[in-house]
Design a protein with these regions (language model features):
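Membrane-integrated ABC transporters
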Residues: 1-53, 68-87, 101-105, 109, ...
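Juxtamembrane helix-loop junctions of ABC transporter transmembrane domains
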Residues: 10-21, 44, 52-65, 90-137, ...
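An intracellular "coupling" helix at the cytosolic face of ABC transporter transmembrane type-1 domains
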Residues: 29, 33-36, 126-133, 146-155, ...
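Transmembrane helices of ABC transporter permease
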Residues: 34, 38-51, 157-212, 283-297
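Helix-loop-helix
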Residues: 175-193, 264-333
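Pre-NBD coupling/linker segments of ABC/ABC-like ATPases
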Residues: 344-356
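ABC-type nucleotide-binding domain
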Residues: 354-609
Length: 609
């Protein structure tokens, strides 16, 4: 009875996609063609060894015929020695040629694995912000590593196993058919039935189940990464048991899918062995009939049986190889999808590096909407930010503040209009040159699990230690760094978890100081810090903004009083703008309403304390 997709199995849909082998094989062959010489050496070595194996049954039959004539027959002794020498020579040739192929396939496969992993990483790095927001990092890592090792299995299966096996099968059937057409025809028909049945079962019966189990394998990796990355939150709520249970729910679903896949492999193997048993009976029975009819000598029967057992072994292996091939294809499918995924933002063909000197930013009639949203967030937005001007962005959540700075960084492309920096359209500039001249301090700074010095110098990789320390001093970070056991060599943990929120903020500010970019984006995050850290960060922020075009996303309005101009966003429109004094004077203004609400909240909290 055919299994119905389970309602909670969101991954079942993957089984409905076109055959993965039609997508994966061209992908791998493209990488083979990048190493034509190595591909030729491998094919020559392995096929040459296979041809040597093909002729061994012939000389085995000659040896048996010579032995049956008796040792007294001089010609028989001569024939036996010739057959023996040929068998040894063929065996030696097979070993040498096979070693040539094996030695060549090691660097061949390693280079492809390296290229595939590098290319996948490069593409993932350049995918859109939305893609990363909607993807588990752990799942992506699992797709790449699983696909990379599946490529090793794929190469071994095709080049070391399947190609030689098919050559032996074809060659043996031809040679056998030249001696006895009837037996050759029986083996040929049986082999074709076996191979066709194996391919059909692998692609139509096993592959859909394997796709689903692979999707759940990826989900297990994502669930693990999600819980481990947020371990501090798990501990703070004492939720270890809850996360254990959540993982086990995913693992149980994964186990059911994998169990189904593995059972399908077993059922397929049972069918394969049954077909081989029928073929064996037909060949042995046919050989006996030929011998009983006097149409075959003992040597002929030996040749037939030796050839058949070689064919039998290779046929059995072909079944296993096809299953392995299908398994490797399924394991690579998600990796190939990464390579086929379109990049979110692509440089124009004639893109040139942008040169930002003053930092004037102009939005000219900009229209923008997210993804498939019909209603645009921005519809004809225009604003001119002067070089060196310090701008605050204020508004309710979802009003368009964060989108504004993402468009400045060109993390998204506008739907209409254009954005200019120093008179240059950023859509015509290379992304790398644009973003390298815009420093950003995020609300939740993200640090690499590397040393503090490496994190500070991330925007200026060639910076000297003296420059790194000076940037840390300007960010009020130098003193706390020196108190750490290894100072600037201290590893900060994944995403900087070894540091407090205020310390991470100051490291991020030091990174921005060292980058020394003409445009600065500050996602203000002092509201969640203690008063001492807030004062240190506020002082560093004021120092950092001097002489730079600065855009501050303000979450606490008290931090924007000193800015030149404040832009008040509401539903994608700039509804108010001016300095703090001008905006607070508007009785019915949104800015004044937000400011008074925050002031009342602050007073309530202070009174409660």
């Amino acid at each position: 009875m055919r299994r119905k997709p389970q309602p909670d199995d969101a991954m079942t849909i993957k089984a409905q996609k076109p055959a993965a082998i039609r997508v994966v094989m061209p992908f791998v062959f493209r990488h083979w063609l990048k190493q034509p010489v190595m591909t030729a050496v491998i094919a020559f070595g392995l096929l040459g060894a296979t041809v040597a194996d093909l002729f061994m049954p012939i000389y085995s039959g000659h040896l048996v015929d010579a032995l049956t004539k008796g040792a007294q027959d001089a010609s028989a002794r001569h024939d036996a020695l010739i057959a023996f020498a040929a068998i040894v020579a063929l065996g030696f040739t097979s070993i040498v040629l096979r070693m040539v192929g094996l030695q060549a396939i090691v660097p061949f496969t390693l280079r492809i694995m390296s290229d595939v992993a590098r290319d996948a990483f490069q593409r993932v790095q350049r995918f859109s912000t939305d893609w990363h927001a909607n993807s588990f990092a752990g799942s992506t890592v699992r797709k790449v590593t699983r696909g990379m090792w599946a490529l090793d299995l794929y190469n071994d299966t095709i080049l070391l196993a399947l190609l030689p096996s098919l050559a032996v099968l074809l060659g043996s059937m031809i040679l056998l058919g030249l001696h006895w057409t009837s037996l050759g025809l029986v083996i040929a028909v049986g082999a074709l039935i076996y191979v066709a049945m194996t391919v059909a079962l692998s692609t139509r019966y096993i592959a859909p189940a394997a796709r689903v189990s692979n999707a759940w394998d990826t989900k297990v990796g994502g669930t693990l990464a999600d819980a481990l990355t947020c371990n501090a939150v798990v501990k703070s709520f004492g939720a270890e048991a809850r996360e254990d249970a959540r993982l086990m729910r995913v693992i149980n679903r994964w186990r059911r899918r994998v169990n189904r896949t593995w059972l399908r492999y077993n059922y397929t193997a049972a069918v394969q062995l049954s077909v081989l048993l029928c073929l064996r009976g037909s060949v042995i029975g046919g050989s006996l009939l030929l011998w009983m009819a006097g149409r075959a000598s003992p040597g002929d029967v030996t040749y037939v049986l030796t050839s058949y057992y070689i064919i039998h072994a290779y046929l059995r292996d072909v079944g296993m190889h096809i299953n392995n091939l299908q398994r490797s294809v399924n394991d690579m499918e998600e990796l190939v999808e990464i390579h086929d995924e379109p990049l979110g933002i692509v440089d124009a063909a004639d893109a040139q590096p942008i040169a930002i000197t003053g930092g004037r930013i102009q939005f000219e009639d900009v229209t923008f909407h997210y993804g498939g949203h019909r209603v645009p967030l921005y519809d004809g937005l225009s604003i001119d930010i002067r070089a060196g001007e310090r701008i605050g962005l204020v508004g309710r959540s979802g009003s368009g503040k964060t989108t504004f700075v993402k468009l400045v960084q060109r993390l998204y492309d506008v739907s209409g209009g254009r954005i200019l920096i120093d008179g240059q359209d950023i859509a015509r500039a290379t992304q790398q040159s644009l973003r390298s001249q815009i420093a950003i301090v995020q609300q939740e700074p993200i640090l690499f699990h590397r040393s503090l010095a490496e994190n500070i110098a991330y925007g200026a990789p060639g910076a000297s230690m003296a420059a790194i320390e000076q940037a840390a001093r300007l960010a009020n970070a130098h003193d706390f760094i020196l108190r750490l056991p290894k100072g600037y060599g201290t590893l900060v943990g994944e995403r900087g978890v070894k540091l407090s929120g205020g310390e991470r903020q100051r490291v991020a500010l030091a990174r921005a100081f060292l980058a020394d970019a003409p445009v600065l984006i500050l996602d203000e995050a002092t509201s969640s810090l203690d008063s001492e850290s807030e004062a240190l960060i506020q002082e560093a922020m004021e120092r950092l903004m001097k002489g730079r075009t600065s855009i501050v996303i303000a979450h606490r309005l008290s931090t924007v009083r000193s800015l030149n101009r404040i832009l008040v966003f509401d539903r994608g429109e700039i509804v108010e703008q001016g300095n703090h004094a001008a905006l607070i004077a508007r009785r019915d203004g949104i800015y004044r309403s937000l400011f008074e609400r925050q002031a009342m909240e602050f007073a309530r909290i202070t009174a409660a304390e």
